[in-house]
Curated annotation (Swiss-Prot):
Bias-annotated ranges (Polar residues): 562-586, 1123-1138
Composition skew (Basic and acidic residues), residue ranges: 264-276, 283-298, 597-610, 1391-1402, 1409-1426
Keywords, in A-Z order: Chloroplast, Coiled coil, Membrane, Plastid, Plastid inner membrane, Protein transport, Transmembrane, Transmembrane helix, Transport
Domain of life: Eukaryota
A family per Pfam: Ycf1
UniProt entry tagged with the keyword Membrane: yes
Localization (cell): Plastid, Chloroplast inner membrane
Region (Disordered): 264-302, 546-610, 1123-1151, 1372-1436
Bilayer-crossing regions: 24-44, 70-90, 93-113, 130-150, 170-190, 218-238
Protein name according to UniProt: Protein TIC 214
Classification lineage: Eukaryota, Viridiplantae, Streptophyta, Embryophyta, Tracheophyta
GO biological process: protein transport
Signal peptide: none
InterPro entries: TIC214 (IPR008896)
Amino acid sequence: MNFQYLVKIVAGSYYNISSSILSKIINSVILAGLYYGFLTALALKTSYILLIRAMVSENQNHKAAATTGLILGQLGQFLSIYYAPLYIAFGRPYTLTVLTLIYFLVNLFGNNLDKNASSFGAYGNKIRTLEILCIFLNNLILQLLNTCIFPSSTLARVVNVYLFRCNNKMVFLISSFSAWLIGQILVLMCCKLVLGRGQNKNSIRALIKKYLVRNSMFFLVVNCLFGSSLFILTIQSLGRIPLPIPTQNLSEISRIEKREEERLKKSGVAKEGKSTEDEEDLSHEKDSFKKEPYSKLENEDEEIEKDIEQAIGTLLFDYKRWTRPFRYIKNNQFEQAVRNEMSQYFFGTQQSDGKSRICFTHPVNLSMFWKGISFLLRDKNYSNKLTRRWVQRNKKKLKSIKSDLVNRIRNLDNTIKIEFGTPRTRLCTCIHENETKQEYVPEEYDPLLAGCYRGRIKKEQAIFQKQENETLTNPLDTLIDVLENNTNTQLFKANPIGKQKISFEEELRKKVPRWSYKLITELEQISYYRNPPDDHDIRTRKAKSLVVFDPSKHPNMETMEDSGNIQNKSSDKTINPQNNLTNSKTRTSENDPDDNTTEKEPKDDKSYSIRYSHQSDFRHGLIKDSMRSLRRKIVITDLFKGNVHSPLFFERRKKKNLFSFSGLLKLKQLFITWSAQKEFWDLKDSKKKLKIKDKKQQETKERIEIAEAWDSFELTQVLRGVLLVIQSSLRKDILLPSLIIIKNLGRILLFQTSEWSHDFEELEKETHVPCTYNGVPLGEKEFPRNWLTEGIQIKILSPFCLKPWNDEKKPLPASENFCFLTIWGQETDHIFGRPRRKPSFFKPILTKLDTSLKKINVVQFFKEKRTPESNIVKEQKVDDLSDNILNEFQFSKREKLEAITNRTNLIKTKLETIAKEKKTVTRDLDKNLSKKSLKQIKFKLVSNLSLFQYFLKLFIQKIYTLFLRNILLISGLLKKILNGEKEQLIDQYCSKNEKIKKVHKKFNFILNRKSKLSTNFSNLSQAYVFYKISQEMANFSVCKLRSILNQQVKAVFVKPEIKESFARYGLIQIQKMDKKNLQLRTRQWKHWLRVNSQHHLSHILWSSFGAKKENWRKKIKRCNKFNKQSLQKGNSKGNSNLDDSKNRNKNNLILNKNKKDNFEKCYRYDVLSSKFIKFEKKKTSLFHRSRISLTRQKQILYHKNMSQNFLFALPKNMLVKNLMGKSERIHIPYIEKDLDRKYLSFENIQFSLKKKVNIESWIPLTSRGNRTKTYNYELLDELELMKFIDQIYKKEKEFLFPCIERNKQIRNSKSKYSFIDWMGLNQKLLKHPVTNLELWFFPEFVSLLNIYKLKPWVLQSQLLLSKLTFNKLSSQQQNQTTTKINTETKNQQKNRVENEENKETENQQNAETKNKQKSKTENEENKETENQQNDESEDDPQLAYIRSFMKKHLLFQLRGESIFKKSGFKNIQILCLLLRLMNQNEMLFSSIQREKLNLHIMPEIGIKDLTLEVLEEIGVPEFLKEKRVNFEPFPLYINKNGKFLIYQLLNMSLVHKIKYPTNNESRNQGVITTQKNNNVASHIPENILSSRRRRELRILMCLNKKKKKCKGTEATNKSFSYKKKCAKIWEEQKSTIEFFIWPNSRFEDLTCMNRYWFYTNNGSRFSMLRIVMYLPLKNY
């Protein structure tokens, strides 16, 4: 312990000694002098430039003069630090500025003169001596002026402080002077070394002498360069020195205020002197209008000159620079800023009389320094003589005070009680009436009585006291007086109270020191409504504006504004009774030369969005031309610095420690117990999350840096924008199409189907949208304003990605399926982000190859072969062990031990022998097999090489033949198509497909022994077994199956349903007992066939079906086992519309099973079912069906599975994907299935490569109707239709419901061609191109076409029939419409009867006259409606303006809340894009469907309900409080065309609309109940009537279903007479006759309706159009 104590003492003493020595060395005067001397010598100054120029020249005199001048100048400056007179002479700023400016002007002009000695002649020597003197003086004066490159006065201040502190001042001076000399010598030596190397090289020296020194221009250029560089550096150093010119005092009134007051006075006098006569005003206006252009030009020239003078003056000579503040603190918008005048000294606490008291002592820096040192001086007690004196004085004072108190207390008893008041001074206030009288201030507010109080006393004015007693006069009198006099001065007289208020406030106002001018920011300059200033004073952050909305591009806005202004003017004229006064005021203001408001400037109503840069903005908030603080300690290393700081504060930066002690402690605590493993993994996951966050932050930083790097220079944005545009055009037009072509050519070479159409469809989906620099999207073809200078981004929507084959995967949502384009043509997820990885083209190909190769079984060449010797050894081993175990019990213990040892030895020896045998066997096998395998491989290679040449030849020939075949086929097909051989092509194409699609399916589930089905055949159903047998058509004989099934024993186990199905095919003979059950089943078949007619099937199938009748009859006769008698009986017992087809096809029962023809497969079931009906022996009428109670107003049926708000509807159970690949086999749909499919020809839809349409997008896949309800209504009744639509609208409550209004221009349309080409009947009229060309070149369309024709799935829903106008009709209008309809119907029916009896020529003339009359009436109606609309807009122009703008755009206001973040800004981007687009409706619908626009944010107030009263009641701020976003939307509308309405009208009469409305019970249950038979034969009116009258009957039945009974006067037509006959025969089922007739009609009847409906008389192109003009439809 003692030893340690001694060591500590020694170490402490050593430390104290070393620290004392070091402190003495550091604080020594010599070292400080050396340090400051080197600093003064090595300070960079402008005078070194003159020294370098002298050193470069080879003249020794110049060098000597420059060095001596520099040393002497620095010596004088050095002495001025320690000598006060020199310091005052060279340190004052005003003297320096005066001397330097004069000196540098002389020096600049002197350097530019030609100084050749030859030009001066005899005076050359004298001039050379003057040059030497000038060099000497230049170097001396520059050193004295102290014009440093980095100007600072710290060195002089530090030297002054040290001289004040140190005691040995002479030692400090000598040491600093010696250090200064050493520093100067070092500087000169360095200059000589640097410049001497260049002179020593002979080559450089020779070149300088040869070319430069001899040339006189060289000296001039060098002198000019040095002079200009000197001038620039000195001005830079003089920038901080104040100018020696007296500036304006800050307390005085500014000149700007004076100018404003003078201008107001002049304008006021001018306005008073002007007359109010109209004639004089007009003459003055004409003269001023004539002089305007000349005066404007003169004023513009003067303003330009003034601006140039001001700019030059502010650059060179700004006299207010030193008076301006560094930072501008605004106090009020309407006043100048208050000056925070603060002296360099402040009040600090010091001790006086032993107490700390406030005193005016020292600067701020010293007080801060004292606070920093004070904590070091707490422990040390310093004795001071002053403190002892203060203590003694205080003690004496206390003694004197105590003695006085004691004496007073003693004298209290002796004194006499005398009351006297102590006089006190108080504050008084003067009264206005009598200044002599005064009033005391209340004691509460008197500072002399109650202490100081900073409250303000409010004096009661005499005016207010008088006004309380006076009665109120009529306020209209004062207004009339003001209007009659019409002077600005009397306006102030009307309010004397306010005038005296102002004077009273001026009395109490205190003058505060303010700046002499009001400084303005850039935003304030823009926000000036009138007379904006020329320039702003305070710097703002750098920003770039972007135009979001430009009203000039929308002419509707401008027209509405103009109309609104005109109407406002007219209304003002009517309202104002005194127009003369208002006109005089406006004219005087226009003629006033001082007011600048008369000049109408163009209104900039554009809405902008501001973009700020991410750069560090150090001049934000600074004042122009003000002094800047020198930041000497700042070091800028990077190109852009966000936070600039000095190197002294590097420790305060964020440090990333690799090893932290706190982290190690946490890990130690975690690993103490095993239960802490979960915490450890949680910590690991948190670290991963932190790493991911850091990566994201780094990426954002990189993106910001890249963006700012592009934005830093001007030309970079131009270059980047051009490159982006080039890359987008290259990508869309060249690169991607070429890749698609290469891919599809490769697929063709590899004998695979091409994917041209799919790839080009996806490429067309890719759209390039130009965006702003921040990524705000604009229109598709509209670039942002000034995009070359401000920057541009290109956004790619649904980018195209090339794939080896197109999979049916779900596409990405629209919010994720976009990217941005880079300069190099790559895709990025973010702006200026890293390029994203694309899925590789070859990766799926390689994976598919790998999977296919793995399936191949690799031949196992090397297999283990066991020798018989090893087996023998094992058998011996087993025998020996068994014998030993049996004999163990016979021996004693010793013998047992010996036996055990022997046995172990035997086992060891045997194991060793077995191991040796294995080694020998395996070695031999390896050698033999390796030799054999190598030989086999060599042999195979040699044989394959010889055959490889032949293989190549065969491969090339095969490709060649395939290409030739395809080319010949395409050319032949084109010729046939052009010649019109369509039917032959269809048959050929189908037969080829059938040959290719031969599939041989075998009984794999029975033959395979390893299958699980072979063990348990009970799991198999009989239907499945027979289905498999039916598929195997070629290898299985039907006769064997027939013999097996006819056996009584085996037929018992067969189910009855399967028996019936085989009986239909003729495989089983049906017994009598089974026929009863079969008859019930046949009724369902019979009902299905009667309900479904040939219109369910395509015309292609019917044509091919009719062509192959004879072949079918031959094949059916072979397999027919039924008796002809039963068939004849079935035919005689009933009559129907299908009798003809049944009699023709008596023997067509079963089709041939070997030939797999698609068309035969489709229709063999139809033939079978038709024959099966006749097989039945029951006496029932074939025309038996479920009766439906149809009323007058039931015409169109709504299906339960149809969605009722889409143009094209799809049932729930029918999908396009389910139909793909099922064209080979089509089954009969039972009644349980949905029978809502109908055929629609593909020729109606014109496909083209330019406009690809997604058919699946037309069809909704869901249905909203839960219950089956039949909504049937009359087409003629408009009011009932409106009620029906209102019911549907209330139920579904969909916000977006299309509003379709009636277009009156459709009646006047006299187009010859109709919109719909139904079944190709009017093909000659439309002059169709060959539509099948595209389908033959693109086989993908063929499969879709065939599938659609076999199983069509599209249905026109009821939306086409509805007239969706939701306008509320008043009761009067409804009555008027009903009366008009009734009158028109009567008149038109009369005309119809008369016209039928007349000739065709008379009919045409009548039609033409009626058309003309109708066109006139319709034009008049259109004019009336337009006039009504104009009247409404004129009555209320503001409402008209609001409504028109709301119809065009969706505008909304935002309130900055935390909840409204992402979704709101997405809506903003989409709405900005919609404002820019040309076709806004398409983009708007798509954005709503993709759920990008959030329409739930909109308010519930409609546009029609919006009035001025509503707006006033709501109020803007209250409405914004209720809802975060203020929408004023307009519901989406549909553009109505003539074609659309024609299509809507013609679809009312489509086949599937009224064809088969069955009972609701049968559709819900799926089973048809049997009814009693009516033994009444069914009559078909079509077969009775002639062709002409048959068509007339059909049209009249469609159009006149409202009337049930026929009157005698209206029954002249044969159709009506026939209708009466039908009523007598079959009175109960009138509606069913109409219902049955309509399905057999075709589009020929609809074309007649088209002619009859729109009054078109040109019927020459149709043979059947000879119908008389009938009554028009009442709705139209």
